[in-house]
């Protein structure tokens, strides 16, 4: 019965998307929905299957193909995203995120203010992570192959929060750190793309890294991934001033991070 209700709900949601596309004035679109319509590419189920298969092969052969990784996430993640939506709607904090649709990039976050926060706060740790790893929140690709705007936003949210998860877990952006974070995200979100990145990313580890991965990182990542509360309903932007070390000790959302040494490289 629950499965039938969920399928009916998804059908109604897709019908609503089509009505918005044809007669947008009847249901005013918010800023994210308007942006999503500019980038959205409608595809058939068969095209979705082909894109999913092709992007998975391309991503395995070359993990630097971020466009293929993004395509893989969108063409294989719809079922997991519906479950994430249910989780978000069951949480007060998640409901606020769905209403506000916050974005994480340099035009929406006051990074100058975050730099002035005490070094033990989440906001300061996030800025330090970006600088230390030479990454920017502006590099995420727009969602193109998800029709429902709610699911498209959740995929966008997942992408934009990825570096925040790195920060919380104290993981660098090298292959070893990425694989560990992907395991945590996979077990927390059930997104097929995350499982793929975790499994096939580990294959590309160097022998020394693989030993560390099997001995320390993999058990740690699986334990954290299973024990953490859902990460998607976390309104990270309202936690910039939170003490990161205290949060890791007291919150089931932020568990103690694995100690990283230079030899892990």
Curated annotation (Swiss-Prot):
For this UniProt record, the keywords arranged alphabetically read as follows: Lyase, Membrane, Metal-binding, Mitochondrion, Mitochondrion inner membrane, Ubiquinone biosynthesis, Zinc
Q: Where in the cell is it found?
A: Mitochondrion inner membrane
Q: Which Pfam families match?
A: Coq4
Segment forming the signal sequence: none
Any idea which positions bind Zn(2+)? 162-163, 166, 178
Pathway given for this chain reads:
Cofactor biosynthesis; ubiquinone biosynthesis
Q: What is its EC number?
A: 4.1.1.130
Tell me which InterPro entries the record gives: Coq4 (IPR007715), Coq4_euk (IPR027540)
**Superkingdom as given in the UniProt entry:** Eukaryota
What the record says about family reads: Belongs to the COQ4 family.
Give the note: This protein may be expected to contain an N-terminal transit peptide but none has been predicted.
Q: What protein am I looking at?
A: Ubiquinone biosynthesis protein COQ4 homolog, mitochondrial
Originating species: Drosophila willistoni (Fruit fly)
């Amino acid at each position: 019965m629950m499965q039938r209700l969920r399928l009916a709900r998804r059908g109604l949601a897709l019908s609503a998307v089509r009505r918005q596309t044809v007669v947008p004035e009847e249901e005013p679109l918010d800023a994210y929905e308007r942006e999503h319509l500019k980038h959205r590419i409608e595809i058939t189920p068969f095209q979705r299957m082909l894109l999913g298969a092709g992007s998975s092969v391309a991503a395995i052969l070359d993990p630097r193909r971020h466009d293929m990784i993004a395509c893989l996430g969108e063409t294989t993640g719809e079922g997991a995203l519906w479950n994430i939506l249910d989780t978000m709607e069951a949480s007060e904090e998640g409901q606020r995120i769905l209403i506000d649709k916050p974005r994480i990039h340099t035009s929406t976050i006051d990074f100058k203010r975050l730099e002035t926060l005490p070094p033990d706060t989440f906001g300061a740790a996030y800025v330090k992570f970006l600088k230390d790893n030479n990454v920017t929140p502006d590099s995420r690709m727009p969602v193109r192959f998800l029709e429902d705007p709610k699911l498209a936003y959740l995929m966008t949210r997942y992408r934009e929060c990825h570096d925040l998860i790195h920060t919380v877990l104290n993981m660098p952006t090298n292959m070893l750190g990425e694989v560990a974070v992907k395991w945590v995200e996979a077990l927390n979100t059930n997104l097929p793309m995350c499982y793929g990145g975790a499994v096939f990313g580990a294959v590309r580890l160097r022998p020394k890294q693989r030993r560390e991965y099997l001995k320390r990182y993999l058990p740690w990542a699986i334990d954290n991934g299973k024990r953490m509360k859902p990460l998607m309903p976390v309104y990270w932007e309202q936690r910039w001033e939170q003490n990161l070390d205290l949060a890791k000790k007291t919150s089931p959302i932020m568990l103690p991070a694995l100690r990283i040494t230079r030899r892990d490289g």
